């Protein structure tokens, strides 16, 4: 297995700080979603990189009344991979997901 690319200590520190910031942003968004302060559609329409890189399964599991089983069932019905990220949704997948979540 090849070695990872060599980067400076400063570049590594910046990348780690960015990763921590993105995790905090996603956690805050999911918390607000669970509390009903945000709507799931905001994630699909978001241009924030941290939100765009969230997995669809995580988004669904954050909705009130949803758990892993319900989230996986919806993903299977709609034909979306369990590891698909918001930014990777195709237009057909997005339309099917929106139809499935209509009224929630």
What function would you assign to each model-found segment?
Residues 1-62, 68-104:
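Structure-specific DNA junction-binding interface
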């Amino acid at each position: 297995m090849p070695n990872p690319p060599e980067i400076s200590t400063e570049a590594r520190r910046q990348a780690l700080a960015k990763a921590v910031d993105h995790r905090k942003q996603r956690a805050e968004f999911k918390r607000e979603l669970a509390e009903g302060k945000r709507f799931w559609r905001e994630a699909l329409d978001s241009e924030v990189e941290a939100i765009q890189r969230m997995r669809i399964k995580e988004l669904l599991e954050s909705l009130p009344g949803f758990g892993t089983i319900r989230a996986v069932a919806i993903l299977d019905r709609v034909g979306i991979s369990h590891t698909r990220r918001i930014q990777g949704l195709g237009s057909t997948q997005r339309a099917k997901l929106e139809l499935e979540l209509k009224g929630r």
